From Swiss-Prot:
Role description: Catalyzes the pH-dependent efflux of sodium and lithium in exchange for external protons.
Lineage: Bacteria, Bacillati, Bacillota, Bacilli, Bacillales
Pfam families: AI-2E_transport
Keyword list, A-Z: Antiport, Cell membrane, Ion transport, Membrane, Sodium, Sodium transport, Transmembrane, Transmembrane helix, Transport
Cysteine disulfide links: none
GO molecular function, one term: antiporter activity
Protein family per UniProt: Belongs to the autoinducer-2 exporter (AI-2E) (TC 2.A.86) family.
Activity-pH behavior: Optimum pH is 9.0.
Keyword check for Ion transport: yes
Protein name: Sodium-lithium/proton antiporter
């Protein structure tokens, strides 16, 4: 099939391969800059609206939008850290009672197991007991290794590095927001008029699809939030609003879903002996999963024109290649490729 490729297509193919290889090594160390560029692209419509609505120059509009964005991030971060510290303190205070509850459940299980295995062969009972003890020992050893003071200290030692990355992100974001029009002009200056029109079409299509993807995720997550809020008000009204907000935020991330919160919560309630609440939480998780799997493909197909299978494959491959950043870049690359085909930049019309 390669003999049907023209010289221009060979050049584009080689450039694409070089771009992928370079990206594989460069992307992991340039995550703050890439996130800053993507954020600047998302905030650019707000900057243009400020310029049009209030007759401001580019620098003043960028400064206002940037400050509003930083204030929003600061408020959300402060709230998240405060809630996390509060929950950790409550967990530490209630840890003895949690341990006692789990011990009581384990004692009840052991008593039930002893009464259940009275008529069984002693060899079988001994084998099961040994396997259970090995599992408990392995789990305890793993938890002990993860919770060692050295690991906690190593994580704390990386906090300055994270702060530096965040500072680089903020500085790069402000500069990208200022320089976006100039960067676009320089990029289009390297193209012919025909190619420039195709690139503009691809950018417009890509922007439409990306915002459509975010809109679709938001619409699906709103449905999830309403159903989750109603269900939790019926199951545990004391924490219904807070947990619904947490589940809504987590569910906004593709693939992860509400099961990440409701699954462990239901399992814990079953372990401590609250079978009714554990079963209700598990049922709510199943209902939310069914809603997402039913509604999401239709909403996604309507807003971005990318099949759920292609989205899943792109996310998984990107996640395996370059980590969390690939989880986002994977579908974007597929969308960019499809947009380039629609614009005529890439001609994929050969047949075997």
């Amino acid at each position: 099939m390669f003999r049907y490729l023209s010289k221009r297509q060979w050049i584009l193919l080689l450039l694409g391969i070089l771009f992928v290889v370079a990206g594989y090594f460069i992307l992991p160390v340039s995550v703050p800059l890439i996130i800053a560029l993507i954020t600047a692209l998302f905030l650019n419509p707000a900057v243009r609206w400020m310029q049009f609505r209030f007759r401001l120059n580019r620098k003043m509009a960028v400064t206002i939008v940037f400050l509003l964005f930083v204030i929003m991030i600061g408020l959300l971060g402060t709230y998240a850290v405060t809630r996390a510290v509060t929950q950790l303190v409550e967990l530490a205070d209630n840890a003895p009672s949690y341990i006692n509850q789990i011990n009581n459940v384990l004692i009840n299980w052991q008593n039930n197991m002893n009464s259940f295995t009275q008529n069984m062969p002693s060899e079988f009972v001994d084998k099961v007991s040994v396997e259970l003890q090995n599992t408990i020992d392995t789990t305890t050893q793993t938890l002990s290794q993860k919770l060692q003071l050295s690991n906690i200290a190593a994580f704390a030692a990386k906090i300055p590095e994270y702060l530096i990355s965040f500072l680089v992100y903020l500085i790069a974001l402000f500069l990208f927001m200022l320089e976006l029009p100039r960067l676009k002009d320089k990029m289009h200056g390297n193209f012919t008029e025909s190619t420039s029109e195709k690139v503009k079409f691809m950018n417009a299509r890509l922007s439409y699809v990306v915002f459509g993807f975010l809109k679709a995720q938001f619409l699906v997550s709103i449905v999830i939030f309403v159903v989750c809020l109603i269900g939790l008000f019926w199951i545990t009204p004391e924490v219904a609003i807070v947990m619904s907000l947490i589940i809504w935020i987590v569910d906004f991330v593709p693939i992860i879903g509400s099961i990440v919160i409701l699954g462990p919560w239901a399992l814990y309630m079953l372990i401590v002996g609250d079978i009714a609440m554990g079963g209700q939480l598990a049922m709510l998780a199943i209902i939310l999963l069914a809603i997402r799997r039913t509604v999401e493909p239709k909403v996604m197909g309507r807003h971005i024109g990318l099949s759920p299978l292609a989205t899943l494959i792109a996310m998984y491959i990107g996640l395996q290649l370059i980590g969390l950043m690939g989880f986002i870049l994977g579908p974007l690359l597929v969308i960019a490729f499809n947009s380039a085909k629609e614009a005529g930049i890439i001609r994929w019309n050969f047949k075997l």
